[in-house]
Amino acid sequence: MKIKHLLCFIALCLFFTPGKAQQLSVMTLRNGATVYIWEDKSKPDVFGMIAFKVGSVDDPEQYTGLAHYLEHVMFKGTQTIDALDWEKEKPIYEKIIAKYDERAALSDPAAREAIDKEINDLTREAAQYAAGNEFSLLVDHMGGQGLNASTGYDQTEYHNSFPPSQLEKWLEIYSERLIDPVFRGFQTELEAVYEEYNMYNDDRGSRMREFIYEQAFGDHPYARPIIGLPEHLKNPQLSKLIDFYNTWYGPQNMSIILVGNIDAKEAIPMIRDKFERVPRRAEIHREKKPVRQFKGRTEKSAKIFYYPMLALIYNGVPSNDKEEIALDICCELLSNSQKTGILDKLQLDGDIMSVGASQNAMRDAGILMINAIPSFDANQNRWDSHKSVEKIVLSSLRQLQNGEFDEATLEAIKQNMIREYDLQMESNEMKAYILASLFNTGADPSDIVNFKEKVKAVTIDEVKAVAKKYFNDNYLALNIQEAKNLDSKGQKLKKPDYKPIETKKGAKSEYAKWVESIPVNMPEVKYCDFNSIQQKQINTRSKLFYNLNPENDVFTMTLKYGIGTKKMPKLEYAVALMNNAGMLPDIEPLAFKRAMGELNANCTYAVDDNYMYVMMSGYEKDLVKACQLLSKQILFPKLDDKQLQSLIGSAFGSRQMEKSSIGTLESALTSYVLYKDSSDYLQRIPTRDLIDLSITDLTTQFQAATNYECEIYY
């Protein structure tokens, strides 16, 4: 059966159901904590998060890194969690705090080293009265998964998923950790943070991001790295960390977020009982700091990355600003996942290797950024200049500035944003992060529920107005250049030679024993119903597996062909070109992308060692038309020679930088250890042969791959 008829048959086989109702509840506890409960009974679990409205932007100027340090030590227990004998541990803990204060007053390295050894001895002594890692073990005991935390510029989150039957235990331990916390093992966590700092210092991607933020935000704390400055990391004070906790971790600065299979009416009394015992703290008065405003064109350069890149930075708006959604639409008009944007055309036409536009709206300020990677000429072994790239990017940008786009293009962009929102709403975790962001910025909870209506309401005149207002002649041009050798930024943080800390293996605190004994009403187990996955044999080489989406009317479909790069090495490059292909006889890539966009659909091609994939998502009402359009492209792909030359240049440039990339070297070594001569790095097309790739050959390779057996997942 030909692919066109195959996809149309699939489209007619499927039946659709409306999404299930969900409910968002919001309340404030007596101590000021904000509670969000998003009920979704279709989920098997609950995602729980405690989010604090504090991040690295709130670090004291002379003690940067405290927010991140605190995230690490918040897992070290309290006067009950991890405590085997707090009365004996307490005086040792207080000595450790005093020793760090004593150390901070010294400048002599030898004297500091002597105190470090004293602290190490005290830490080893205190460890005899602590169970060690008990919070994590309690989460494991209740069936929790994905325990983690993260520190950002404006907020800090602690979270994991857990079975609905374990709600009381989760509320108990997450509230208990906020009552009399004990920052045990501070010294060992310093080692972990030092290693993290050194890792970022060696990573060119991290160094590039730091450079961009330093230049974009000037004197604002957003310009500092989240992990902190090295001179402050080398001079830690536990007392300062305790002060930071007491200042920022009060309930009025905290949100409790529960998303998934939960009943708000049953949960609220338990939440009150557990979290209202967390003591209210003094009100916080946060001073908003001024943000750098660009005037005219400002240029900065740095040799820090694997390859050259141009970044154009414009002043934007803070999160929750009335113009934020309109600016999101502007960025989508420039570049988007469907590759229908004004800047996307530069990549589709082969004029530039890669380009994208994005908005980063944070609590105090925001920036708009355009990133562009020049093309690499494999024949001349050189990159295009930053100047030429900036010229063609600005030329395309003028189309946005001048409002050169129509209603149809705008509506397709808005529908794509709505579809991506619907996909996010399928995830408990994504919902929780969105709620945490709303809490952090003080936005109304209705913003998340009414997001689709807000997007639909944005008019073409509003988009044109903000495009002209923000994408103006006042911007920062960052010429990021290739670094042959990356010098260390400042001094690497040397890991101290401490004696290892040994805790009592297998020991449990009385608190842990009590938590584990809390009775649980086991829910009715809902096993996966494999019969709900319907199967249809399309022909001798194609089989369809499909199931209904209970969440919404968004579909995802994957065609999985039984051939990969192990047997067809050139397929890697054929598939890469298919992602930017047009359609014979005369449909150009951008026209094809926009035709898909008008159907609210998105299609991507991928390949691995053993399989080739064609993936499409969209709305069910447009499934038949989207399948018809996709099948025509698969049958009659129009690959572009200019794109091929850009792809070859990209491969040449990428391989040139491999020996300077720690991550790539690690990957190559691991691959060789596992597979020896069958390693992907040894089996790939030699660099010297890339120049001989042709459109005819790659088209033939792709079409041959579509003749292999195919499984379709809907």
Regions found by a protein language model. Give the residues of each.
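A conserved hydrophobic secondary-structure block that centers on an alpha-helix together
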Residues: 233-244, 580
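Bacterial N-terminal signal peptides
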Residues: 7-15
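M16 family metallopeptidases and their MPP-like homologs
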Residues: 38, 43-59, 65-66, 83-176, ...
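Bacterial N-terminal signal peptides that target proteins for export
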Residues: 1-7
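Proteolytic maturation boundary segments
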Residues: 21-34, 263-302, 344, 447-561, ...
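Catalytic glutamate of the conserved HExxH
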Residues: 69, 73, 329, 573, ...
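Non-catalytic, conformational "gating/processing" segments within enzyme and secreted inhibitor domains
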Residues: 183, 190, 205, 209, ...
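Carboxylate/His-rich catalytic cores and anion/metal-binding grooves
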Residues: 194-204
